[in-house]
Regions:
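Transmembrane beta-strands of outer-membrane beta-barrel pores
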Residues: 40, 53-57, 83-87, 127-131, ...
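C-terminal beta-signal and adjacent terminal beta-strands/loops
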Residues: 241, 407, 537-542, 599-607, ...
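Gram-negative outer-membrane beta-barrel transporters
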Residues: 221, 225-227, 231-235, 315, ...
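Short acidic/polar hinge/loop motifs at secondary-structure boundaries
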Residues: 1-20
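Membrane-embedded beta-barrel scaffold of Gram-negative outer-membrane proteins
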Residues: 168-193, 400, 426-519, 524-526, ...
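Periplasmic-side early beta-strands and strand-to-turn transitions of outer-membrane beta-barrels
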Residues: 45-46, 54, 66, 70-154, ...
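Solvent-exposed loop segments that connect transmembrane elements
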Residues: 91-98, 135-151, 196-204, 248-293, ...
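Outer-membrane beta-barrel translocator/receptor signature
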Residues: 11-14, 25-92, 97-107, 118, ...
Length: 681
C-alpha cells in the first residue's frame, strides 16, 4: 500500500504480467498507470532445492537459497533466504566514501494446501531488511549542461525493514470461483538526507516512519469460456502510519535562510515608496542551530465494491462487450505536531529617523516559540468505469477498443511544514518587534506607534490544509489496438494507440525546503505501442518493442509561470527494446544460450519549464548461460558500452540565491559485469 514498499527482491518467479492503462475497475486505487502482476511458483507444482551465488564488479556479491518440498500430495511448502551487497557506483568527493552502497537480506516462506477438490489455501510471509548509503546526487549546471561532483557533508542514508504476508482461500464451485485474499504489511524505515547536498552546513532532513496496513478482498467470478463472464467483489483496507520528520537548520542555514532572508525582506520593504517612513531594521540570531521536530500520524481507511461483466458471441462469434464499475470510498486524516525544540532567540537592531531630532536606536531582543499543531482530513468517493468492445478473428487475432477511468489518491506533504514554520518566523518576528516597540524597551523614552514609523502589519493567515495537501489525480484513457499471430507459432504482433485526458496530474516540484507533490492542472497524452516477437527456429527468439508518447500540459499555471503546451516531466517520448536469444543444445541435459539486449529511452524532460532534459540514450546488455541438470552458470554484463546518462534529475532551494534553485542529477550505472552460479539438487 505504501510506495516506500514497492522496491524489493523476488525469488522463484513463475510469471510476470504487465497490465497497461488504468486497472482501477478490478484492482482499485493507484493503478491508473497500469499494474505489474507477479506470481511466484507454487511448491505444489515444482519441488527441489537450489543455491545461487552471485559475483560482480563494484564488490557485488550475493547468495540465495531456496527449497520447495511436498509433505503430502496436497500440502507443500517453500522456504528461501537471500543476501546481496555492493559498494555503490559513485564516490562522495567531500567524505571520500562510496555513495549508494547497498546491503539487503531477507527470507520468504510459502505454504500451499489443497484441502479437497473445492478448497485451496495459500499463505506467504516475506521479510526484507536493507541498508543503503546514499545518495549519489551530483551538482548540475543547466546552462552549460555540465555535471559536477557528488560533494556533501552530512549523513545521507536509507534503512528499511519490511514484512509482507498474505492469506488466500479459493473455493472452486461448478458454477463460480470464490476467493478471499487477506494482506498485512509492516514497514519500518529511516531516511537521512543532507537536504542541500552541498559541503555547507545548511540543513538536514530525517524521515522515519512505521506503517501497519491490512487489506481484505472477497471476489466471486464465473468460469472462463461461458457466454456471460463476470466478476464482482468487495474490498477494504486500513493503514496507520506514524512519521517523525525533523528538519535541522545548521549554522549556515540559520545565517542564509533566516537571518539573511529576513534582512533582505526588511530592506526590500523599506524600498517601497508607501513605506518611506519605515525604520532601518536588521536582525541577529543567537541560535547555533534550530531543530524543527515533526510528528505526524496519518490513519487512512477505505472500502470498495466492484463488478465487471463480459457478454461473448454478440450477434456473431468472436464479438464481445465488457462493462465494469468500481466505487471507492477513502478517508485520510493527518494529526500534525511541528515545533522547534528550542525557542528562536536574537535581537533586532532598529534605527528610527525622528526628523529634526537624533535618530533613535533600539536593540530589541526577541524570543519566538515556534510550532504548528492540528489535524486535517480528506474524504473521496471515486467511480472507475470501464467499457470495452473486442472482436476475435479465430484463435489467432483480435482487435479491441476501450475506455477506462483511473485515479490516484491524494495525500499530504510533510515537508511543507518547514515552509509553514518559516512563514511563522517572519510573521511572529514582526509581530513581536511591533509589540515591544509599542510597549517600551527603548531606554525609557516613549516609543513611537507602528503607524508613526511606517511599519506594515504582518499576519500569518496560511490555510494549513491547502498548503500541505494535494488532490486526487483523475484520467480517462481511450485505446484501440489488436494482436495477431501472423505466422503460425512463429510471428506475433501487437499494436495499440492511446489517448489520455488527465486532470489534477500529480507531479514532483520544488517548494521551499524540499520536493513536494502538487497538482498540475490538465494534461493530454497520446501515442502508440508496438511489438513483434518472432521464433524463426526453435533455437532463436527475437523481439522488438517500441513506444511513443506525446504528453503535454493543457492547463497549468503555478502562479508564476504558464506551462501550457510544455511537455510533462519524467515521460520519455520514445522507448525501445530489442532482444535476441539463441540456444545451442550441447547434449540432452545441457544448453548454451546467448542473449543480447538493447534498451533505449528519451527524450525525457525533467522540469515543467522544459529547461533540463535527457536526450535519447541506449544501453547494451548481454549474457551467456550454460544450463545443465545440476548447475547453471551465467556470465552477464550491463551497459556494456558504458553509456553516460542521467537516471534522475531534481531541483532544490539554493540557500545562497533563492531566485535560482540548485540542480542535481543522479547518473546512470556505469558498465557492470559478473557471474551467477546456481547449484540444483
Amino acid at each position: 500500500l505504501d510506495k516506500s514498499a514497492f522496491d524489493f527482491d523476488f525469488i522463484d518467479i513463475a510469471s510476470i504480467e504487465v497490465l497497461k492503462g488504468p486497472q482501477g475497475t478490478l484492482y482499485g486505487r493507484n493503478t491508473m498507470a497500469g499494474l505489474v502482476n507477479i506470481k511466484t511458483l507454487s511448491p505444489l507444482e515444482k519441488q527441489g532445492s537450489k543455491i545461487k551465488l552471485s559475483f560482480g564488479n563494484y564488490n557485488l556479491w550475493g547468495v540465495a537459497a531456496t527449497t520447495s518440498q511436498k509433505l503430502t500430495d496436497d500440502f507443500a511448502f517453500s522456504i528461501n533466504a537471500r543476501y546481496r551487497q555492493d559498494d555503490g557506483y559513485f564516490k562522495n568527493e567531500y567524505t571520500r566514501q562510496n555513495s549508494g552502497s547497498t546491503r539487503s537480506g531477507g527470507g520468504r516462506v510459502q505454504l500451499d494446501w489443497r484441502v479437497n477438490r473445492h478448497w485451496k489455501l495459500s499463505f506467504s510471509g516475506d521479510y526484507e531488511g536493507s541498508d543503503q548509503q546514499g545518495y549519489p546526487y551530483a551538482g548540475y549546471d543547466k546552462t552549460l549542461k555540465k555535471t559536477g561532483s557528488i560533494s556533501y557533508n552530512d549523513e545521507a542514508s536509507y534503512r528499511r525493514d519490511i514484512f509482507t504476508s498474505g492469506l488466500s482461500a479459493q473455493y472452486l464451485h461448478d458454477r463460480f470461483i470464490f476467493t478471499s485474499t487477506t494482506g498485512y504489511q509492516f514497514l519500518d524505515d529511516d531516511m537521512h538526507l543532507d537536504q542541500d547536498f552541498t559541503p555547507r552546513a545548511i540543513f538536514t532532513l530525517q524521515q522515519k516512519q512505521k506503517m501497519h496496513a491490512v487489506s481484505q478482498e472477497f471476489a466471486v467470478k464465473s468460469h472462463k469460456g461461458k457466454r456471460w463472464e463476470w466478476v464482482g467483489g468487495l474490498f477494504g483496507f486500513y493503514q496507520q502510519t506514524h512519521t517523525d520528520g525533523p528538519v535541522d537548520f545548521r549554522q549556515d542555514g540559520i545565517d542564509l535562510l533566516i537571518t539573511k532572508q529576513t534582512n533582505d525582506q526588511l530592506a526590500a520593504l523599506k524600498q517601497n515608496p508607501a513605506l518611506a517612513g519605515m525604520p532601518d531594521i536588521t536582525i541577529d540570531i543567537d541560535n547555533r542551530n534550530l531543530y524543527i521536530d515533526g510528528i505526524y500520524k496519518t490513519p487512512a481507511y477505505g472500502a470498495a465494491a466492484f463488478g465487471q461483466a463480459t457478454l461473448n458471441r454478440i450477434f456473431i462469434d468472436g464479438l464481445s462487450a465488457t462493462i465494469g464499475l468500481r466505487i471507492d470510498y477513502e478517508h485520510t486524516r493527518i494529526y500534525h505536531h511541528t515545533h522547534a525544540t528550542e525557542d528562536l532567540t536574537g535581537h533586532a537592531n532598529v534605527t528610527i529617523n525622528m526628523g529634526n531630532r537624533p535618530p533613535m536606536s533600539i536593540q530589541q531582543p526577541f524570543i519566538l516559540p515556534l510550532g504548528i499543531d492540528g489535524k486535517e482530513s480528506m474524504n473521496t468517493i471515486e467511480l472507475s468505469p470501464k467499457f470495452e468492445v473486442k472482436y476475435a478473428i479465430g484463435n489467432k487475432s483480435f482487435v479491441y477498443a476501450l475506455a477506462t477511468r483511473g485515479y490516484r489518491s491524494g495525500g499530504y506533504n510533510f515537508q511543507m511544514f518547514s515552509n509553514l514554520i518559516q512563514s511563522q518566523i517572519r510573521s511572529s518576528m514582526m509581530s513581536e518587534l511591533m509589540k515591544n516597540m509599542g510597549g517600551g524597551g527603548n531606554g525609557g523614552r516613549p516609543a513611537p506607534s507602528r503607524s508613526a514609523v511606517g511599519m506594515p502589519a504582518f499576519e500569518n493567515t496560511t490555510d494549513v490544509n491547502q498548503a500541505i495537501s494535494y488532490k486526487p489525480e483523475h484520467s480517462w484513457n481511450y485505446e484501440i489496438g489488436g494482436r495477431s499471430q501472423l505466422i503460425d507459432h512463429r510471428l506475433f504482433a501487437d499494436l495499440s494507440l492511446f489517448y489520455i485526458d488527465c486532470h489534477d496530474q500529480q507531479i514532483a516540484a520544488v517548494s521551499g525546503y524540499g520536493r513536494v507533490t502538487k497538482n498540475s492542472g490538465r494534461t493530454a497524452s497520446y501515442g502508440l505501442e508496438a511489438s513483434l516477437r518472432a521464433t524463426p527456429t526453435n533455437r532463436l527468439l527475437l523481439s522488438a518493442t517500441y513506444g511513443y508518447t506525446h504528453a503535454t500540459f493543457q492547463e497549468y499555471n503555478d502562479g508564476k509561470n504558464d506551462y501550457k503546451n510544455n511537455f510533462v516531466p519524467f515521460a520519455p517520448a520514445h522507448t525501445l527494446a530489442l532482444s535476441g536469444a539463441y540456444t545451442l543444445p550441447l547434449d540432452k541435459e545441457t544448453d548454451l544460450t546467448f542473449d543480447l539486449q538493447y534498451l533505449g529511452r528519451g527524450k525525457i524532460y525533467w522540469t515543467e519549464a522544459n529547461d533540463a532534459a535527457q536526450n535519447f540514450y541506449g544501453l547494451v546488455n548481454a549474457s551467456i548461460i550454460l544450463s545443465g541438470k545440476y548447475a547453471d552458470l551465467k556470465l552477464w554484463g550491463k551497459n556494456l558500452l558504458n553509456q553516460h546518462y542521467q537516471a534522475f534529475y531534481f531541483e532544490t532551494m539554493n540557500a545562497e540565491n533563492l531566485s535560482m534553485p540548485n540542480s542535481f542529477v543522479q547518473c546512470g550505472r556505469p558498465i557492470t559485469f559478473g557471474a551467477d552460479i546456481t547449484i540444483k539438487f
